[in-house]
Amino acid sequence: MFFKFLPFFLLYLNGLCAQVEYSLEEKVGQLFMISFHGNEVTEELEEIIDRVHIGGVIYFNFLNGELSRSQVERLSHQIQSFRGIPRWIAVDQEGGRVQRLTKGFSKIPEASFWKCMSPNAIVAMGELIGKELKEGGISINFSPVVDLTNLNSNLLHSRTISSSADEVIAIAKSLLFGFRHEGLIGVIKHFPGHGAVNEDSHKEVPVTEKKFSLLLKEDLAPFICLSQHVDAIMTAHMIVKDFDPKFMVSFSQKWNAFIRNDMNFSGLIFTDSLVMDAVQKEYESLETAAICAIEAGADVLLFGGESPVGSKKTLPLPRIEAIHKTLTEKAKKDPVFLKRIEESFSRNLYFKNKRGIFPSAQLCQTSFAE
């Protein structure tokens, strides 16, 4: 398995960046994934992609409209046509009420129904989702949700597979197998599990009193098991008082160390969206939140979705540029922060190469055994 070769992986990352000289601005920009308005690339978006060296974009139906399959393909082609490192293109194509692309795309049943399907049917569904998204130029699906069903809350409910960790693991593994067969990256979310809380992080900071020992047996079990089958994990904006009572998971060095060391995970760590109210209530600015997330160990900062909740507006593109400038200036003055930027930049490049997003001719010819 790939994760057994961590020391060689780190050497590879160092060699990877030695082949091509990248500016600090490019390195910082690769950690940004943004959303935007409209079904075409505007001049403003093109300028931001160019100046900030954006690492990825995410599509939303409430921002980009009801895109047909041909429109998705054209938009993705436009985004990838600009100079610089090719970008991640992502979507939340979970199924049920969270299926961002519907026009011409197969209808995906909500996750709570999946336990009624056979393993082969789950794999086939994963392959179909993967095929349709890849044809549209999409490389990442923020799915499956592997939070356990919380029977006392309607927060995620139909978006979750089951209240049984074993059932979640088996079904999610089949879906991820289907994704991977089609070359689509699946992202398991929302680590360590919203099933342990009742509050909505879009609006406030969820806090759980659940003991860490119980989390290990229940909510964390799917993440620990499935981490060996995925390239990426998304962290949640929630506090587990028994593990790190001070910081939300996305901003917790202790939680990120658990992912890297205890779970032996060397893939990408995505934050949940930093425009959520839980983040904006805890941090004085998005600049501060972004710095804290990177210092904690995040590889990709997600600036996607509604801000504030219910407004159907995403973060203005000039704000993205301002945040990028702040992070770049900090990296120039802080060697420790610069090292974190370079680690996450290298990890992004490695996985873009591994999954065929980044042209291999631009990288060193080092092969990597999985």
Task: Give each language-model segment a name.
Residues 1-8:
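Sec-dependent signal peptide recognition
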Residues 12-15:
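N-terminal signal peptide c-region/cleavage motif recognized by signal peptidases
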Residues 18-50, 250, 262, 280-370:
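Preference for extracellular/luminal or secreted protein segments
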Residues 40-46, 217-224, 256:
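Alpha-helical scaffolding within the catalytic cores
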Residues 45-46, 130, 172, 176, ...:
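Generic hydrophobic/aromatic pocket-lining and core-packing "Φ" positions
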Residues 50-170, 190, 195-209, 236-251, ...:
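Enzymes and membrane/adaptor proteins characterized by extended Gly/Ser/Thr/Asp/Glu-rich
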